[in-house]
Regions:
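N-terminal beta1-alpha1-beta2 module of alpha/beta enzyme domains
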Residues: 1-76, 80-81
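A structural signal for isolated positions on well-ordered beta-strands in alpha/beta enzyme cores
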Residues: 4, 48-50, 83, 115, ...
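Active-site oxyanion-binding pockets that recognize sulfate/phosphate
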Residues: 23-24, 31, 89, 130-133
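Short, surface-exposed connector motifs at secondary-structure boundaries
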Residues: 50-53, 79-82, 175-178, 197-199
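Short, solvent-exposed loop/turn segments at secondary-structure junctions
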Residues: 55-59, 90-91, 125
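Short His-Asn-centered micro-motif
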Residues: 59, 85, 184-187
Length: 205
């Protein structure tokens, strides 16, 4: 059996003191605790650490830039795989080329230890980033396909209803192969890019 860990970086209130020092201190403590636990998990043989991307989730999820966290983790761990669980994909959050670049950068830094999971986000996040909720599924699927295309082609271009991307060399490139595999829960569709023969996912009902 292979065991994974999932982190949102909870920073529960109350945060004693005055803003902004109280928030900064609480977040620093939560990140430090997470890093300590993940480094121990690496030594104990856990398989993957998954970090979720969320925005504005006060107290519950303060991990808005998992690529930055994974970049740091890549330098203080040796074997544990680094999972984006999930990376928000509808057009409006992050341009697909930037997603391809940041995920591949972590893959290079970690010597091929990246797992890439994707999602559509929550209505609260979509509203703040100007994402059309009704189109979010179609936009996410288009963005995912374009990212994989950028990894699989030396000079990639993409033209669709949502994106016009000219021919460019997107770099760095992922060190791992990409073969899309789709997982669905009753509430949200999750797409994971499989980089190995083994891959599993458990979603809440």
């Amino acid at each position: 059996m292979k065991l994974d860990l999932f982190y949102e970086i909870d920073v529960p209130r109350p945060w004693p003191g005055e803003f902004p020092e109280n928030q900064r201190r609480a977040e620093q403590e939560s990140y430090a605790e997470a890093f300590e636990q993940i480094q121990l998990a690496d030594k104990l043989g856990f398989n993957t650490i998954w970090l979720v991307e969320h925005h504005f989730r006060e107290g519950r999820s303060h991990c808005s830039a998992p690529e930055v966290v994974h970049g740091a983790l890549s330098q203080v761990t040796e074997n544990i795989r680094l999972g984006f669980g999930v990376c928000l994909m509808p057009h409006g959050f992050t341009p697909p080329a930037r997603v391809a670049e940041k995920v591949a950068t972590v893959d290079v830094l970690s010597k091929g230890r990246v797992e890439w999971g994707t999602g559509r986000s929550t209505p609260m996040e979509q509203t703040a980033f100007g994402v059309d909720r009704e189109q979010s599924r179609a936009m996410a699927e288009d963005a995912i396909k374009s990212v994989v295309h950028m990894w699989e082609n030396e000079y990639a271009e993409w033209h669709s209803e949502f994106l016009d991307f000219p021919k460019r060399l997107v770099c760095p490139n992922s060190t791992s192969g990409t073969q899309p595999q789709v997982f669905e829960s009753p509430k949200q569709r999750i797409v994971l890019i499989e980089r190995r023969r083994y891959l599993s996912a458990v979603a809440p009902p």
